[in-house]
């Protein structure tokens, strides 16, 4: 039986490479890692190389600990390898270079604009809303089982649930003790550490927006909240630091939604000699072996969504 698929990958003359660094990596560190990343991607078959720091293209989010590279290849007549062969070659060079994170080289999707890379894009959904920690646990279990399948070369989850963060809780009892309106305190906390829209104004033939927020140096650390004050019922100024509780936590950097549920995306690459259809069948088997379908659901995105839709709507006919 010949393995089936949706559309075959083609040599489009360019590749994508993505570098995901460890949680809480600063932009400055990412710039240093990007130099090593760019050096490892140099090859006689590469015509131009452009890197962007601070963008995770697989999840379409801006994050300081990620880099993306657009690799333009030389004309087919000037290089002996196909784009698929070059992707494997560059992936090996990245592995040898040593890096503080995860890197991958990807071919673009067969249909431009439908997703960001080839392979299979699967989504696991938290149907009961049990929270990010529960979803991450299910994703890890699914990923471990899927990685053992012979059809699958690589199964990556983009849900980083161990991002070090600071949880700031506005204490109601402290607000009551200091005679501070909790809504006012919450507004100041959000406006100074985030931003708040004020209004529009017209000038120089254009319409402008007005926002307020604290200066960058005053938002660099939570200790700076000693300089933010709230006026209480007696007219006295109370520092925000006296109204909040702060603790260290680990949580996800972002949460994606799919079909109204919290979800996690998996990027899955077929092993050579296997089609995306075989990979999708393998993933479905793994799902039913490891997941409770009443608590966790699954779906596809990008090219995989189209492939699954075609498989479910068009039957095989023989004349």
Task: Provide a role label for each language-model segment.
Residues 28-116, 128, 132-144, 173-195, ...:
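Solvent-exposed, membrane-proximal periplasmic/extracellular interface segments of envelope transport
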């Amino acid at each position: 039986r010949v393995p089936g698929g949706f559309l075959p990958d083609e040599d489009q003359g360019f590749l994508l490479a993505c570098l995901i660094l460890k949680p809480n990596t600063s932009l400055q560190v990412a710039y240093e890692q990007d130099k090593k990343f760019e050096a490892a991607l140099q090859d006689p078959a590469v015509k131009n190389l452009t890197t962007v720091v601070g963008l995770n293209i697989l999840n379409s989010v801006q994050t300081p600990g990620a880099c993306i590279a657009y690799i333009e290849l030389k004309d087919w007549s000037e290089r002996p390898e196909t784009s698929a062969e070059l992707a494997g070659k560059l992936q090996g060079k990245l592995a040898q270079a040593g890096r503080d994170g995860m890197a991958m080289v990807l071919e673009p999707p067969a249909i431009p604009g439908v997703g960001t890379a080839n392979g299979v894009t699967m989504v696991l959904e938290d149907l009961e809303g049990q929270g990010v920690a529960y979803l991450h646990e299910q994703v890890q279990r699914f990923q471990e089982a899927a990685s053992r399948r012979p059809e699958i070369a690589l199964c990556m989850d983009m849900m980083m649930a161990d991002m070090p963060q600071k949880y700031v809780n506005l204490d109601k009892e402290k607000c009551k003790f200091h005679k501070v309106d909790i809504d006012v305190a919450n507004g100041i906390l959000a406006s100074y550490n985030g931003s708040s829209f004020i209004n529009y104004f017209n000038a120089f033939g254009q319409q402008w927006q007005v926002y307020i927020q604290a200066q960058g140096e005053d938002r660099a650390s939570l200790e700076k909240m000693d300089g933010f004050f709230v006026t209480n019922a007696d007219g006295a100024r109370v520092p925000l630091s006296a109204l909040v509780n702060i603790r260290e936590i680990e949580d996800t950097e972002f949460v994606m939604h799919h079909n109204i549920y919290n979800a996690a995306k998996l990027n899955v690459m077929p092993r050579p000699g296997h089609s995306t259809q075989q990979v999708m069948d393998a993933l479905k088997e793994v799902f039913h072996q490891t997941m409770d379908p009443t608590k966790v659901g699954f779906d596809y995105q990008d090219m995989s969504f189209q492939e699954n839709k075609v498989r479910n709507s068009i039957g095989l006919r023989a004349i």
